[in-house]
């Protein structure tokens, strides 16, 4: 059995819960959120999926647990509290891996603080930007002629700029093999 902790039960956290419940693995899932409204959203969304393993369990709490072993923690809180939540989690629990939603933090100093916390606790952190793993992007990267400048344009509507732009920036960074990018606005 794997111990899964999801911190933040709102829109993203409840979707992570649905995905976890589809797993064939036996999971002990704990969902934490101080908002009863968010807990209610998570409960409702959990009831919409058929468990991939009938032995998996879900519990809901308002506080981060203490003195627990956690295989995977998904931190899907608002960015302005994410570093505080991470510190509270890692100072009182043993966590093997953490998946962070993006944008990670609101202050530059919090990046260094969390990296140090991850190192000190021997936890591995991941940022939820999975497009690099898609076979289409892997094949595209192999076909790109990187001897010339590469331009990318993204069009769309009804999606949050900050939430979704990071995915396109990340995939472009992956495709060109650089993390230093120049952005231009188009109207």
Predicted feature descriptions by range:
Residues 67, 71-132:
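Beta-strand-loop-alpha-helix segment that lines the small-molecule cofactor/substrate pocket
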Residues 54-69:
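Short acidic low-complexity segments
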Residues 14, 18-22, 44, 87, ...:
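Short, well-ordered alpha-helices that flank and scaffold nucleotide-derived cofactor binding pockets
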Residues 1-51:
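N-terminal Rossmann-like dinucleotide-binding module
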């Amino acid at each position: 059995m794997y111990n899964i902790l999801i911190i933040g039960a709102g829109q993203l956290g409840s979707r992570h819960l649905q995905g976890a419940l589809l797993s064939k693995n036996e999971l002990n899932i704990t969902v934490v959120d101080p908002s009863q409204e968010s807990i209610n959203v998570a409960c409702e969304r959990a009831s919409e999926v058929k468990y991939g393993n009938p032995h998996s369990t879900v519990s809901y709490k308002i506080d981060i647990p203490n003195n627990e072993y956690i295989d995977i923690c998904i931190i899907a809180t608002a960015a302005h509290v994410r570093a505080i939540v991470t510190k509270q989690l890692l100072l009182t629990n043993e966590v093997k891996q953490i998946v962070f939603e993006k944008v990670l933090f609101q202050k530059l100093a919090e990046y260094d603080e969390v990296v140090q916390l991850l190192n000190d606790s021997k936890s591995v952190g991941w940022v939820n930007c999975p497009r690099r793993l898609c076979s289409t992007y892997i094949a595209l990267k192999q076909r790109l002629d990187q001897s010339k400048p590469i331009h990318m344009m993204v069009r769309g509507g009804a999606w949050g700029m900050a939430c979704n732009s990071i995915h396109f920036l990340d995939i472009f960074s992956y495709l060109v093999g650089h993390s230093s990018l120049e952005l231009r606005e188009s109207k």
